[in-house]
Amino acid sequence: MSGENIVVWGTTKTLEANGASISNNALAQADDASYDIVNDGSSYPDAEFVLTGAFGTGPTEGTTLALYARPLDVDGTADTEAPETTRATVFIGTFTVNNVTSTQNIVLNGLFAVGVPKKADYYIHNNGTGQSLSAGWTLKVTPRTNKAAP
């Protein structure tokens, strides 16, 4: 049927392909790439984020890793301040962890983020899992939006 609401996805982009270990209560940038909804996301305002990683010792069940954005080029080429563990910037969502040491593929709680910043760097905050996220973690983003079916 034409005209009904459908979900469409863009091309997945890797923001971090091999992240360094993130200690409990520490913050790390996914610094392989920033994400720009115009250039990378087909101007789709929403995005799905997937974090893949493991812990050397099982984290506390149900605790979270937070995802923050640092908006870029907010005034010409001026960027906002980078987030800190005691001062977050733009909260995007959380990844709830399982109490296992095997690799976890974790989808952002709520499945996707609505209205991500136009251009941003992204950070993972290990805010209370009780363990370090092991080196080698990845963060990927897939743009998405709703539109009318043809």
Task: Cite the ranges covered by each PLM segment.
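Noncatalytic modules at the cell exterior or secretory-pathway interfaces
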Residues: 44-51, 113-134
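Short amphipathic, basic-aromatic surface patches that mediate peripheral association
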Residues: 37, 49-59
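Exposed aromatic-hydrophobic patches
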Residues: 102-112
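Short proline/glycine- and polar residue-rich coil/turn motifs
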Residues: 94-102
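Acidic Ser/Thr/Pro-rich low-complexity disordered segments
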Residues: 73-91
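Short coil-to-beta strand junction motifs in C2/discoidin
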Residues: 60-67
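Solvent-exposed, flexible loop/coil segments flanking beta-strands in beta-rich domains
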Residues: 2-45
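C-terminal interaction-tip segments
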Residues: 1-15, 116, 126-150
